[in-house]
From Swiss-Prot:
It comes from the Eukaryota. Belongs to the universal ribosomal protein uL1 family. Signal peptide: none annotated. GO terms for cellular component: cytosol; cytosolic large ribosomal subunit. This is Large ribosomal subunit protein uL1A. The modification N6-methyllysine is found at K47. CDD domains: Ribosomal_L1 (cd00403). Keywords: Acetylation, Cytoplasm, Methylation, Phosphoprotein, Ribonucleoprotein, Ribosomal protein. The keyword Signal does not apply. The modification N-acetylserine is found at S2. One of its GO terms (biological process) is ribosomal large subunit export from nucleus.
Length: 217
């Protein structure tokens, strides 16, 4: 049973959008983030959960993605306007931790040709996995543009050592209804990952990149 109602979320979304689109409009597209605080959870003892949810609308349309591809997918990436690296490019990194860390920071997510996915850990070590950015596989039969949109629309809740998480659930150009729906979907999915569901939720806050925080719970 959800502890927050759509009317409650709508009230805050109205204020958030008014602030970002009227009171203080920025010259870039602000992301709307859901920030979560946990309680009665011990990341050392309790299971560290991880879950992904594909939202109906893409929260960050300008999210940066890089494709590790064979010749076919490197070509396709160019036509989709997405950065790509070949196996040779990855080999040139020479397992250098600094360079791999820089690559991991430069992009929000990665996609890899199915034929290459098994080589990624060998070429790049465990760093992408540690950052929660292990590539999503794509086959030659998949629509690459569709896959890029899927990756941009998928949010990930992953508990590490600290009891707070933040995920992008939308942006300030979205319609009010769309944003309310994305927030409710994200909250309900997140709560379903928790051991004791709502008993583990300490706080739920939504905020735009530069705007004030609105507490939902």
């Amino acid at each position: 049973m959800s502890k927050i109602t759509s009317s409650q979320v709508r009230e805050h979304v109205k204020e958030l959008l008014k602030y970002s689109n009227e009171t203080k409009k920025r010259n870039f597209l602000e992301t709307v983030e859901l920030q979560v605080g946990l309680k009665n959870y011990d990341p050392q003892r309790d299971k560290r959960f991880s879950g992904s949810l594909k939202l109906p609308n893409c929260p960050r349309p300008n999210m940066s993605i890089c494709i590790f591809g064979d010749a076919f997918d490197v070509d396709r990436a160019k036509s989709c306007g997405v950065d790509a690296m070949s196996v040779d490019d990855l080999k040139k990194l020479n397992k250098n931790k600094k360079l791999i860390k820089k690559l991991s920071k430069k992009y929000n997510a990665f996609i890899a040709s199915e034929v290459l996915i098994k080589q990624v850990p060998r070429l790049l070590g465990p760093q992408l996995s540690k950052a929660g950015k292990f590539p999503t596989p794509v086959s030659h039969n998949d629509d690459l543009y569709g896959k890029v949109t899927d990756v941009r629309s998928t949010i990930k809740f992953q508990l590490k050592k600290v009891l707070c998480l933040a995920v992008a659930v939308g942006n300030v150009e979205m319609e009010e209804d769309v944003l309310v729906n994305q927030i409710l979907m994200s909250v309900n999915f997140f709560v379903s990952l928790l051991k004791k569901n709502w008993q583990n939720v300490g706080s739920l806050v939504v905020k735009s990149s530069m705007g004030p925080a609105f507490r939902l719970y």
